[in-house]
Amino acid sequence: MGMVGRDIDDLPKNAANYTALTPLWFLERAATVHPTRTSVIHGSRHYTWLQTYHRCRQFASALNNHSIGLGSTVAVIAPNVPALYEAHFAVPMAGAVVNCVNIRLNASTIAFLLGHSSAAAVMVDQEFFSLAEEALKILAQESKSHYKPPLLVVIGDESCDPKTLEYALKTGAIEYEKFLEGGDPEFDWKPPEDEWQSISLGYTSGTTASPKGVVLSHRGAYLMSLSASVVWGINEGAIYLWTLPMFHCNGWCYTWGMAAFCGTNICLRQVTAKGVYSAIAKYGVTHFCAAPVVLNTIVNAPPEEAIIPLPHLVHVMTAGAAPPPSVLFAMSEKGFKVAHTYGLSETYGPSTICAWKPEWDSLPPIKQARLNARQGVRYIALEGLDVVDTKTMKPVPADGTTMGEIVMRGNAVMKGYLKNPKANEESFADGWFHSGDLAVKHPDGYIEIKDRSKDIIISGGENISSLEVENTLYLHPAVLEVSVVARPDERWGESPCAFVTLKPNIDKSNEQVLAEDIIKFCKSKMPAYWVPKSVVFGPLPKTATGKIQKHVLRAKAKEMGALKKSNL
């Protein structure tokens, strides 16, 4: 048999056989296949896929008319409203990069982001206009003579106080719908010439003190949009409830993915258990994503706000802080099917999933919940995932006990951090993306996070997983939410300090008795050195996606001062 020459690999790319990957094509296809199907619902507003496509083309055209295109960044400060959904397509259709800004950030942080990203335009929901206005004033003061005011567009919403919109318009901002009128609904948008072109910029300002700009590509967004939908088993025509903020990792890529599957997007400005249950009943919601704290809110909803049993199976994807098995069990008991995922802003959101195995079906529910609480295996678009010894970069044994760092590589990894070569060098060391999360690898190959490297508590030379302590505390009947951090300890160096939010029905008149009861509970369920030496009650500081801000709690624990010598 003759050998095939190199010419088998020398066939060139051309316009007929190669197109840069971009999720923008999903919208064009949805408008063609299901032009009259409802694409987006927000209050009384209903759009079809054809209308959404035309609106996005208008939006892109209007941006180009203001000389905003390739190389530009457009910041959007808004909750889950149609304009934010449209921006995910329209801004890159114009050739620009979309930067979805966390609405819970303060003005000084937003000023930093707008300056760091050189935002050419700022779109802001009317409710947050004063926040954007203050941020722009700070940016102008800091930039001085170099300041160039960005194009300012205000997004009106009938559910908000009309006075805030009136004020914004008086300052010279353009109303969003008026802005669209200046564009062409038949705008001939062009896909990127290179799929490595940037599509999105996000900032990792969640649980750390210093934000870093995460740059994502059209290629990565395309692959992760499909990968996220495939691993979750989303079917064509799914009805998706936006409980997860779209500004968090581009809504875990479901902003683009829902167009690929021609589904329906239900927008929620504010997330409450009542709102979630009502949407399930009213719209027939089939899927939603949420941080564990939202799941906790759902399972602890008052009976008058809940709908039990559910009218149909509802699929839920959760990520963020690892959910306690008790919460997963409670969600399952109420009729929700929870898929547990894990990821970071640097990996387009979730990039691993605890893929369900048929053999788990016959296990007791609590055992199922424990297995499902693991972070699992890689997404289809993530080619490399491992847990390694950071000193040697060798994989840890799959024994379920040896901890190492989670590392990743593949199409699900960001292009890099904007204007931060040092961070890029550190994050991409040895050809892997370093997550900073500590995990074990089980015999079945599934990984399970034990802690963030900075969240490990070192007490008397022994490592304590704050996550393990938290999971036990969630079993206490009075605990609604909990976060455990290190507190200085005169004898042990550090000891666990538990910050606890109590359930609404708990008598809070005697916190000392409650604290003693919680500590006693822990002593019966964990090694003595794991037991929290101090318990603090009150609401926990969180990001917009419900992640508990441990850096704030660590600072608070430090301010409390060192614990005096104890025998525990």
From Swiss-Prot:
Keywords: ATP-binding, Cytoplasm, Ligase, Nucleotide-binding. Mostly expressed in glandular trichomes (lupulin glands) after flowering and in old leaves, and, to a lower extent, in stems, young leaves, cones and flowers. Residues 341-417 are annotated as: SBD2. The keyword Translocase does not apply. Residues 272-340 are annotated as: SBD1. Pfam families: AMP-binding, AMP-binding_C. One of its GO terms (molecular function) is acetate-CoA ligase activity. SUPFAM superfamilies: Acetyl-CoA synthetase-like (SSF56801). It comes from the Eukaryota. CDD domains: ttLC_FACS_AEE21_like. Pathway: Secondary metabolite biosynthesis. The keyword Translocase does not apply. Its EC number is 6.2.1.1, 6.2.1.-, 6.2.1.17. ATP binds at residues 204-212, 340-345, 437, 449-452, 547. GO terms for cellular component: cytosol. Signal peptide: none annotated. It is found in: Cytoplasm, Cytosol. Belongs to the ATP-dependent AMP-binding enzyme family. Involved in the biosynthesis of prenylated phenolics natural products which contribute to the bitter taste of beer and display broad biological activities. Catalyzes the ligation of CoA on propanoate to produce propanoyl-CoA. Can also use 2-methylpropanoate (isobutyric acid), acetate, butanoate, isovalerate, pentanoate, hexanoate, 2-methylbutanoate, 2-methylpentanoate, 3-methylpentanoate and 4-methylpentanoate as substrates with a lower efficiency. This is Acetate--CoA ligase CCL3. It comes from Humulus lupulus (European hop). The gene is CCL3.
